[in-house]
From Swiss-Prot:
<feature type="region of interest" description="G3">
    <location>
        <begin position="242"/>
        <end position="245"/>
    </location>
</feature>
<keyword id="KW-0648">Protein biosynthesis</keyword>
<dbReference type="InterPro" id="IPR023115">
    <property type="entry name" value="TIF_IF2_dom3"/>
</dbReference>
<feature type="region of interest" description="G4">
    <location>
        <begin position="296"/>
        <end position="299"/>
    </location>
</feature>
<keyword id="KW-0396">Initiation factor</keyword>
<feature type="region of interest" description="G1">
    <location>
        <begin position="196"/>
        <end position="203"/>
    </location>
</feature>
<keyword id="KW-0547">Nucleotide-binding</keyword>
<comment type="similarity">
    <text>Belongs to the TRAFAC class translation factor GTPase superfamily. Classic translation factor GTPase family. IF-2 subfamily.</text>
</comment>
<dbReference type="InterPro" id="IPR015760">
    <property type="entry name" value="TIF_IF2"/>
</dbReference>
<feature type="region of interest" description="G5">
    <location>
        <begin position="332"/>
        <end position="334"/>
    </location>
</feature>
<dbReference type="InterPro" id="IPR053905">
    <property type="entry name" value="EF-G-like_DII"/>
</dbReference>
<feature type="binding site">
    <location>
        <begin position="296"/>
        <end position="299"/>
    </location>
    <ligand>
        <name>GTP</name>
    </ligand>
</feature>
<dbReference type="InterPro" id="IPR000178">
    <property type="entry name" value="TF_IF2_bacterial-like"/>
</dbReference>
<feature type="binding site">
    <location>
        <begin position="242"/>
        <end position="246"/>
    </location>
    <ligand>
        <name>GTP</name>
    </ligand>
</feature>
<dbReference type="InterPro" id="IPR006847">
    <property type="entry name" value="IF2_N"/>
</dbReference>
<feature type="region of interest" description="G2">
    <location>
        <begin position="221"/>
        <end position="225"/>
    </location>
</feature>
<dbReference type="Pfam" id="PF00009">
    <property type="entry name" value="GTP_EFTU"/>
</dbReference>
Length: 688
């Protein structure tokens, strides 16, 4: 149903927007926020009819009053009416001309450039700049002016400027609505995530499917970041997401499960279910994603397919040939056996799911990976989930934005557009987005920038509130918990996905005694700014597949900042564990070093009670802990206040010797008491 803006209706009715808003609220009970609000055409027509009827009624009343007055003094009234009519006609003519001449333009943001307002006013740049100079403002063509200044400037050219209270998120609301008409939906390719335990052949299986070798280029044979690939089978395409196989990458796997349609769980036939396999099963169940089990390495001598199926039943996954509904396909990435059957099962499962999308709408999807390329700037791998993305489109990606300058597929070929379920690399973003961010296509780059700026502002406000909002209760707790230590880390990596995964896995190492906090995470080389931040926060810098630049090295040596660089993630986690072990509060155990029997007691007024004792086992040491045991019951615990051998002070007295001793703050020593001497030894920690 068509709508009309309040200011447009006010113009038609020849009244001000303010008067119309008041009228709508008071007489018609129609709530409007401002002059840019829209009302239904039906309501507008009703208002026009009622107002025209009201005007006629008022006009009739005025005419009746006029006739009555004229009848009282016809000659005088006739003269006055002639003068009045002439004056009214003149004013009405001027007002009508002004109303007709007064154009209306709108601006959507708080500021507008001189160029933009010149185009809207349909005036030359020189004319507009001249008027601004007369108003005392020196501005160039590309300089921005605020709304108040724009309003005054527009008035000089007999134009009214209105500020459109536009909510940039409105554009996204239409995209987010998934109420697609059935006739617009078309079949789309399935999106597959491959999960599995480290070294179970997950990447090798993908290599076998894609008929390419990637594993050899990865450190330690482990995939270091997410990639997206498309393969063709019998004229149909399948999109694969490859997630790292280590347990530390829980966040990455979970992110993959959010965009995937089917999960392939790779389990080695000679190894069975392992910790990362259990995690992958949990993710699939939590995300309610269908699962296909690929039992890999069936060519190995120790392969036992039935054992794997048996272990799967413990997690509620019963194979189809065992009477369950879990698809299990024996495969070998080495010999390529079972690969075709696996792909066929994927296509069969996708047919059952009836995967559909509308390619004829604005695109939306998810960021699979993002990095900063020296030559090309921010490069992002996007997975289009709905609509069609085209070169030249403007998109919002989390708190960043851009206009797509170039687009390429997983083979590195330049393409012009990408439909649903297609992974593409793009150039043209203003910044490197976060892996897992959602992207949406909007009408133009200005709208995209507006949405991104608002999101950044919101994130900044939330950060400031959470960082600087300190209450007395918080301060008290920090003082009270003075023993709590914190290990601050700055994480830099080659790709955003690795940063996110490292952050989450490192923060999980936190214990009650040591808190691990990632102060900053970013993409690119370690620079001087990172060192400055580490100095201020007393933190350590971790680099993953990146190196520090020269300025960073000089600054770190000067400030004593520790920079650690790694190529394999296990090493990073192990080093942090070791660092944490040194920060943990030491644990102690009690070690009894000796016992002595009290044989005689001496009462000395100025000193207290002195016990003459015989060392039965071990030794007694001065300042060690001491317990007084009577009839097998500990009656007092303190420490040795003094220890003497004859008249000389002794550091320790060994077994078989007599000595004199006193107990700190205890004088009720009796003959026959046993003095047990002990020390507290620190336990060296081996694991967290």
């Amino acid at each position: 149903m068509a709508k009309i803006r309040v200011y447009e209706l006010a113009k038609e009715l020849n009244i001000s927007s303010k008067e119309l808003i008041t009228l709508l609220e008071e007489e018609f009970s129609v709530e409007v926020k401002n002059h840019m609000s829209a009302i239904e055409d039906e309501d507008a027509d009703l208002i026009k009819e009622l107002l025209s009827g009201k005007e006629k009624s008022e006009k009739t009343k005025e005419e009746d009053d006029e006739i009555e007055t004229t009848a009282k003094n016809p000659i005088k009234e006739s003269i006055n009416n002639k003068k009045s009519n002439k004056r009214d006609d003149k004013n009405e003519k001027v007002n009508t001309e002004n109303a007709e001449d007064m154009a209306i333009i709108t601006m959507t943001s708080d500021t507008i450039t001189v160029k933009e307002i010149s185009d809207k006013l349909e005036k030359s740049y020189a004319e507009v700049i001249k008027e601004l100079m007369l108003m005392g403002v020196m501005a160039s063509v590309n300089q921005e002016i605020n709304f108040e200044m724009a309003e005054k400037l527009a008035a000089k050219f007999d134009t009214e400027i209105l500020k459109e209270e536009q909510d940039e998120e409105d554009d996204l609301e239409d995209i987010l609505k998934d109420s697609e008409e059935e006739e617009n939906l078309q079949k789309r390719s399935p999106i597959i995530t491959v999960m599995g335990h480290v070294d179970h052949g997950k990447t090798s299986l993908l290599d076998a499917i894609r008929k390419s070798k990637v594993t050899s280029t990865e450190a330690g044979g482990i995939t270091q970041h997410i990639g997206a690939y498309t393969v063709e089978l019998n004229g149909e395409s399948i999109t694969f997401l490859d997630t790292p196989g280590h347990a530390a990458f829980t966040a990455m796997r979970a992110r993959g499960a959010q965009v995937t349609d089917i999960v392939i769980l790779v389990v080695a036939a000679d190894d069975g279910i392992m910790p990362q396999t259990k995690e992958a099963i949990s993710h699939c169940k939590a995300a309610e994603v269908p699962l296909i089990v690929a039992i890999n390495k069936i060519d190995r001598p120790g392969a036992n397919i039935d054992k794997v199926k048996q272990e799967l039943t413990e997690y509620g996954l019963v194979a189809e040939d065992w009477g369950g509904d879990t698809v299990c396909v024996p495969v070998s990435a080495h010999t390529k056996e079972g690969i075709d059957e696996l792909l066929e099962m994927i296509l069969l499962s996708s047919e059952i799911l009836e995967l559909k999308a509308n390619p004829n709408r604005k695109a939306k999807g998810t960021v699979v990976e993002a990095k900063l390329d020296k030559g090309r700037g921010p490069v992002a791998t996007l997975l289009v989930q709905n609509g069609t993305l085209t070169v030249g489109d403007s998109i919002v990606v989390g708190s960043t934005y851009g206009r797509i300058r170039a687009m390429f597929n997983d083979k590195g070929e330049n393409i012009q557009s990408a439909g649903p379920s297609t992974p593409v690399g793009i150039l043209g973003l203003s910044e490197v987005p976060e892996a897992g961010d959602k992207f949406y296509q909007v009408k133009d780059e200005k709208t995209a920038r507006g949405i991104a700026d608002k999101r950044k502002e919101k994130i900044r406000d939330e950060y400031l509130q959470s960082t600087h909002k300190v209450s007395l209760e918080d301060l008290y707790n920090q003082i009270r918990e003075g023993k709590v230590k914190e290990l601050g880390l700055i994480v830099k990596a080659d790709v955003q996905g690795s940063v996110e995964a490292l952050k989450q896995s490192l923060e999980k190492l936190s214990t009650e005694e040591v808190k691990v906090r990632v102060i900053h995470g970013g993409v690119g080389a370690i620079n001087e700014t990172d060192v400055t931040l580490a100095t201020a926060s007393n933190g350590i810098i971790l680099g993953f597949n990146v190196r520090p630049d020269n300025n960073a090295i000089i600054a770190s040596e000067r400030d004593g900042v520790d920079i650690k660089t790694y190529r394999v993630i296990y090493d990073a986690i192990e080093d942090i564990k070791s660092a944490m072990l040194g920060m943990l509060e030491p644990e102690f155990k009690e070690v009894v070093i000796g016992t002595a029997e009290v044989r005689q007691v001496y009462k000395i007024s100025s000193v207290g009670t002195i016990a003459g004792a015989y060392v039965q086992t071990g030794k007694l040491a001065r300042n060690a802990g001491a317990r007084v045991i009577r009839d097998g019951i500990v009656i007092f615990e303190s420490e040795l206040a003094s220890l003497k051998r004859f008249k000389d002070d002794a550091k320790e007295v060994a077994q078989g010797y007599e000595c004199g001793l006193s107990i700190e703050k205890f004088n009720d020593i009796k003959e026959g008491d046993i003095i047990e001497c002990f020390i507290m030894e620190e336990i060296k920690k081996k694991t967290l």
